[in-house]
Amino acid sequence: MAVVVVSIMTLFHHPVLAQMNSSSITSSNSITIPTIASSKIPTAITDPNPSYSLDNIFTLVQKSVVQVTSKVSTSLQNPQMQNTTELGSGFVYDTQGHVITASHVVDGTTLSDVTFVDGSRYTAKTIGRDPYSDIAVLQIMGNVIGPLKPLVIENSSGLRVGEQVIAIGHPFGIANTMTNGIIAQTGYLLSIPDIGVFFPDVIQTDAAINPGNSGGPLLNTKGEVIGLNVGRIISIGAPGPYPGLTVAAPSNALLRIVPTLIAKANYSHPYFGLVGSTLTSDLAQTINNLPRNFKGILVNSIVKDGPADKAGIEASTVDKYDKRHWGDIITAVDDHPVIRTEDLISYIEEHKSVGESVKLSAYRNGQIISVNTILVARPPPQIQNSLGISSPPL
């Protein structure tokens, strides 16, 4: 499947359109309840294959899902418009008061309010953000009424198209709303050029996601987290959004990234520093009469002095006579076949870290070559956008 290039309708801040019942909100300043010491995330439910009705799932998880309210600066010229209240969702990660939400929900602020279903409200500090995965971690400040109930985060690698999923969040500020649907697709790379990022292994679902849902959990029928709801797809240059096209970051990204955000406040993503495109059958036949079904990633451009550049990977070029010289076609990474750009980025995200060596196999001038390179940290989006590359580099 090709890279999907879109904008995310609900990936950005949205003003408050509804609020939780203010009469039920309790100030955290007057609460003095001992914090539970253990930070261990609970194991899965005892029954190895439980499946609950939707109402039971809601009862099981509703106390663990929170509304996230942030004050975001929007204008320096108009004092009356300097702060806008933005809404999102989140869920309890552990008993130490860590809450997971979407990074874009808390972009532009360090302090937010988290409100539980019983109306209890607490101030929370953003302690870690990763714009490349759209994951953020908040720390509730002060003591909390009663024990926190973390949600179980399940491995998302075995998800299948057609499985039932449930989303719980706060669309338009409406408290703890449940929607459901099915998994429509998994495992593709979602590219968002206007902010210079992409998300690998995205989960697509038809569960309704609206402004205010971002950062809430996507659940399976056991009430376990399989994804983090981030937005709704609209196609660039076309009217939208389109119903039934919503996306979530996979739970495996949460399992991999959240502990590092808690410990270090940021997460370093490995990257090659190249822009490539999945080789199509038509393009394959154009390149030196390759077999129609030749598979790989055509290297379109290289980030100067990046890992791919230092390893000698060659990109496509056009000479002064307007003749195109095709770049390398990456066919494998560490001897794992590469068919799509998703395969390359997913492999290094899941199996490699910054500073580790990777072997790339590539087709060049009728033969397969192999080169080794050391992965470096992906630069922040604002720096990446200044590299002169039209698409986010892998």
Each predicted region: which residue ranges?
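Terminal peptide-recognition signature
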Residues: 63-68, 90, 97-101, 124, ...
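A conserved glycine-rich beta-strand in the N-terminal activation segment of trypsin-fold
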Residues: 46-57, 72-96, 120-123, 149-152, ...
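Conserved active-site neighborhood of the chymotrypsin/trypsin-like protease fold
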Residues: 42, 73-74, 92-176, 336-341, ...
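Soluble non-cytosolic domains of exported or imported proteins
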Residues: 48, 52, 84-87, 153-160, ...
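N-terminal activation segment of mature serine protease catalytic domains
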Residues: 15-79, 95, 102, 111, ...
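Active-site loop architecture of trypsin-fold serine endopeptidases
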Residues: 75-76, 80-84, 109-112, 145-148, ...
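Short, conserved beta-turn/loop elements at beta-strand boundaries and strand-helix junctions
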Residues: 71-73, 95, 110, 129-133, ...
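C-terminal recognition in membrane/secretory proteostasis and scaffolding
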Residues: 1-35, 56, 125, 139, ...
